Each structure stands twice: as C-alpha cells, then as structure tokens.
Amino acid sequence: MSSRSPRPPPRRSRRRLPRPSCCCCCCRRSHLNEDTGRFVLLAALIGLYLVAGATVFSALESPGEAEARARWGATLRNFSAAHGVAEPELRAFLRHYEAALAAGVRADALRPRWDFPGAFYFVGTVVSTIGFGMTTPATVGGKAFLIAYGLFGCAGTILFFNLFLERIISLLAFIMRACRERQLRRSGLLPATFRRGSALSEADSLAGWKPSVYHVLLILGLFAVLLSCCASAMYTSVEGWDYVDSLYFCFVTFSTIGFGDLVSSQHAAYRNQGLYRLGNFLFILLGVCCIYSLFNVISILIKQVLNWMLRKLSCRCCARCCPAPGAPLARRNAITPGSRLRRRLAALGADPAARDSDAEGRRLSGELISMRDLTASNKVSLALLQKQLSETANGYPRSVCVNTRQNGFSGGVGALGIMNNRLAETSASR
C-alpha cells in the first residue's frame, strides 16, 4: 500500500477588496459641495454666455458703427468747409450741445421732465429698476434723496413682484387643477360627487397633483407675447415707431433692461393724452410683472439643467472611485447567511464550528449597529411627520421632506423659495 503524500491545502488567494469608504466619501463630498458646484458651474456658463453674446453683437453692430463714424466725420468736415467754421470750434459747440442733451434739452419740443407727471414717470422707472436714463437728478439734494428713495423703493417693488409671482402661480395651479378634474370626470375616472376637501380627495391622485413647470412656462410665454403685441400696436399708432421697434421697446422695458434709446410718453402733447398715459402705465406694470415671473420659471429649467450636469459629473466621479456593479463587495455589518463561509472552510479542511462563534458575534454586532441607525432615522422621520401633521391640522400645511436635496429645489429664498413645492418639478417628492 503506497502512501501518498498529503496534498497541500489550496493556496488562498486574497482578494483585494475595494475601500468601502471611498464612494461614500465621494458622495458625501459631492452632497456637501452641491450648492457650491452649482454656483461655480452657473458662473462658468454665464461667462461663456457673455463671451458668445459679445462675439455675436460685435459681429453685427461693429460694421454699422464704423460706417456711422465715417459718415459723421465727412459731414463735420463738409460743414466746416461750407460755413467757414474751424473744426475745433465746431467740436466745442457740439460738446455744449451734448451737455444740454444730457440735461434734458431737446431740439424738438418735449414735455417738462420735472413736473408731477414727469417726476412720477421717473420714480416709476427707479423703483422698477428700469432706469431709462432720459431723466436724472442734477442737484446734490436730488442725488442724495435718490439713494435713500431707491433703496427702499426697489426692495418693496421686488417684494411686490415676488407676491405677484406667488399669486399667478397659485392661480395657474388652480385653473389647471380644475381642468384636470373636469377631464377626469368626463373620462369616468372621477365620481360626479367629487368635492375638494372630502375624504375621497385625500385618497385620489389629485391630492398631490401639481402643474408642470413646462405648462406654466407655456402659459406665461403666450401671455407675455400677447401683452407685447397689444402694447406694440399702441406704441406704433401713438409714438409713430415701427412695429419691430415697438416690440424691441416692450422687451427692453418689461425686462427692466431700460436702455433709454426709445422712451414712451415723451412728447409735449398726445391725442387722448390721459388715456394713453394710463394705458402706458398699465402695460408697463403688467409687462414687468409677467416677464419677471417668466424669468423665474425659466430659471427653474436652468437649475434643472445644472442639476443634471452635476449628476453626470458626480456619477463619473463615483465610477472612478467605486467598483463596478458586478464586483463583489465586502460589507462589514451586512446581515448575510453563513453557509458560503462554512462551505469555504470545509473545502479548506478547517472546522467550521471553530469559527462560527466569532462570525456569529460579528454578525450580531452588525445587526445591533444597523438596528440602532434604523431606530435613530425612524425617530427623525417620526418627528418630522408629527410636525407636518400638526401644521396641517392648524391650517398651515407645509410640505416636509426628509431628503432635503433630492431635486435641488428644496429651501431657497426669493422667487425660488416662493415656487418651492408649488410646481411638479420643484415638488419635494421628486
């Protein structure tokens, strides 16, 4: 009987396990730096947007400016030669005219700048931040008063714009919800006896329904276009501008850019002057409020694009730091069956029972740690839920979301804070 030499135990190849904290640290850093990353990314995109805009406008307007300079130089030389006036004296006279022009003096008869209607038009352009520039204070007292007056006036007007945005979003949500209820009632998905606030409405899907930001954007855009077209028709007939110039004036005014190259209601007299000034005031007020609301809705779309770009960058970062989806992970505190470990120990000739106690101890420790974390998170969730139910019972429903950074829209100040949780894209459930 030949004695075989005992086979050496198979060599255990130690797998290089990935560092479990790398991905967590990466995700934690991206979570903490989400606002900073969004700010830096938006600043970079705005910089590129400015460069692109400057390139386009320079290509469009620079040739016309060069031609205008050449024509003006030729006109100046011809006038100097024809009338026997030295060119330096003529330029000095033109500088005096420019100073008078800045003070409000025009060759044609214009309305007084600082009577009560003119001053009211001026303060309207100040507090709305339009600032046409056709009228400016020239005295020291007027400039000092403008600083204090504009500080509180602009702040109050911005608050008015935000409240208008809140009202218009609530109105659109109410109308679109009513249309959706009517559509569901026609299709038979909603009972005819359905009423808001009933027990059925709480179980129905309409209880958490919110309008989409794209629908609100479409409605506000159509209203802004309609308002601009009507105002442009009025300015074309009264001011004598081209229709394109009138549309250009409407956008410059409604968006509070206020270049001042075209300014309405500046002639000394108009036909139906009182009616025209009232219409001009109402069109500018509604236009500024509408375009302000439209800008804030567009900013939600821009923020969605920024969040999408940040998610893509975060996924690429985590893909470099974390293992592939199919790679085995060693979880220290995971609750896993011990059959695979016993089979490996039996194949190696070791006694599985010798290591069961140690493995069982580690597994129980992991269970205790996991249960402790779960209990703590449940306490936080229960406290938030109790707060939400209490506020709802008192008539002040506030949506509370545990994952406050799921969509990047929770919280916020100003217009973003007003639209938070009022649209489908800014809802805390997304």
UniProtKB/Swiss-Prot annotation:
Glycans are attached at N78. Residues 114-134, 243-263 dip into the membrane without crossing it. One of its GO terms (biological process) is potassium ion transmembrane transport. One of its GO terms (molecular function) is identical protein binding. Residues 129-134 are annotated as: Selectivity filter 1. Homodimer. Heterodimer with KCNK13. This is Potassium channel subfamily K member 12. It comes from Homo sapiens (Human).
